[in-house]
Amino acid sequence: MLEDDFGRDVSGVRVSLTDRCNFDCVYCHNEGLGDTRGPIDPRENELSTDRVVRFLSVAHEFGVDAVKLTGGEPMLRSDLEAIIRRTPDDMAVSMTTNGTFLPGRAADLVDAGLERVNISQDAMDNDAFAELTQSGAYDAVLEGVEAALDAGLAPVKLNMVVFEPTAGYVPEMVDHVAARDGLRLQLIEYMPELAGHPEWAIDIDRVHDWLADRADRIETREMHDRRRYWVSSRDAGSTADDAAQSVTPDGGAHPDQGMVEIVDPVGNPQFCANCHRVRLTHDGYLKGCLNRNDDLRGIGETTQSMRAAFRETVANRVPYYGEYMTRTDDGGWEINDDYLDVEGDRDPYEYAADDSA
């Protein structure tokens, strides 16, 4: 497994299969790009099936054991099942989607090897959802969630971007996943660097504090140092005093309890310190960081060129948020105590098992 100069190994890749999307979400930096008919064959500027599979084989050579397929909307690709089926056998495959194409395809995707899915759902109300996504597909998304559950993809993660227009919907989304077995909620901090409109950003610590008061149990994932909150359904009548009884023997949750995870990268050096992914764009460029476009390296067509691009990308990865590590006199790296408290700003929870992407 390759490591960058900051000691971060690369164990996962995110592969964008297209920048096309049938939604036009107001917070997205790729708003409704391209031909949104689907599913269709890859466009001329999109990675072919063979190039995607060849790249995944190269990543696997370097110890990468997980891939997340993204877009745009990856299900606009008609070859999605073929890509998943040809992914190395011991590489975990997950996908982020808006869910509208899952009915009728979810079972085939699972049969091909898909293991997990994240579905974007930013509100529980049809009108609010339409305003956020510029689509009338709310019912189709709900059907997609059900199709994923029926196909055996539980737990299904619902992705919700948290910013001014959606902050008021967080409590009902939390109640929804707490009351519904098989669902989890991933709250994603709005990133104005990618989408503009800095006035839409909110203080994500307020959401952390609210969830901490509500949660029965709190833990932290090693990846990105993400905080997880296990929350009981209000209908279940459970309180924090019942936390010891709310945990199953394998460390999971009982059916009347849901998990909420916060992805909060903005200004968070601990997030960067625990990032173990590189990204491949839909048109064949590797990048070491989602927020940067000054480090793009084309993967070319051949296995040899892909190996060279992968090595170079990993070697040149630099944390986006803060110099949390500094050079020592002997050329090594050490924690920058002036920038980041060694213990961090969070309570020292034990890292949880990294069971989902």
Swiss-Prot record:
Pfam families found in the cross-reference section: Mob_synth_C (PF06463), Radical_SAM (PF04055)
GO biological process, one term: Mo-molybdopterin cofactor biosynthetic process
Domain Radical SAM core as annotated: residue spans: 5-234
The keyword Translocase appears for this protein: no
Chain positions recorded as [4Fe-4S] cluster 2 binding sites: C272, C275, C289
SMART domains: Elp3
One example GO MF annotation: S-adenosyl-L-methionine binding
Pathway connected to this protein: Cofactor biosynthesis; molybdopterin biosynthesis
Positions bound to [4Fe-4S] cluster 1: C21, C25, C28
Keywords per UniProt: 4Fe-4S, GTP-binding, Iron, Iron-sulfur, Lyase, Metal-binding, Molybdenum cofactor biosynthesis, Nucleotide-binding, S-adenosyl-L-methionine
Annotated positions binding S-adenosyl-L-methionine: Y27, G72, S120
EC id: 4.1.99.22
Cofactor binding mode and count: Binds 2 [4Fe-4S] clusters. Binds 1 [4Fe-4S] cluster coordinated with 3 cysteines and an exchangeable S-adenosyl-L-methionine and 1 [4Fe-4S] cluster coordinated with 3 cysteines and the GTP-derived substrate.
GTP-binding in keyword set: yes
Cofactor: [4Fe-4S] cluster
Similarity section: Belongs to the radical SAM superfamily. MoaA family.
Described function: Catalyzes the cyclization of GTP to (8S)-3',8-cyclo-7,8-dihydroguanosine 5'-triphosphate.
Name assigned to this protein: Probable GTP 3',8-cyclase
Organism this protein belongs to: Halobacterium salinarum (strain ATCC 700922 / JCM 11081 / NRC-1) (Halobacterium halobium)
Taxonomic lineage: Archaea, Methanobacteriati, Methanobacteriota, Stenosarchaea group, Halobacteria
